[in-house]
Amino acid sequence: GANNGSMEFDRFTEQAGFTGYFGRNEYGNDKDFDGNWGIFDEPFLKWTANKMSTLPAPFYSEIFTISSHHPFTVPKQHIGKFPKGQIPMLEVVAYGDYALRKFFEEAKKQESKEFDGINI
């Protein structure tokens, strides 16, 4: 869900021969923008699971999540939901785990059998 152009992932995917790149611009809903890096993990991963279910098989996909990057913010609706620990990053790592779990729940709902090949 990163801003298009972040770390030049969009340019790399094109140069590497990939046929598509999906980032903040393609997501198209800035109400989920974190104010810094891009789209918060939970909504972007849900959107990604739905998007992946429409891709022709076989396909290869990589996902770059943003929440574990400074300034370590979680969406307003999740503030106080995750343990903070002694370092700021712990709260966003817990949020990232939550978002990833929601991604797999969404992926299981899809009819595509391509989700059987997900690796982390």
Where would I find each of the regions flagged by the language model?
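Solvent-exposed soluble domains appended to multi-pass membrane proteins
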Residues: 1-120
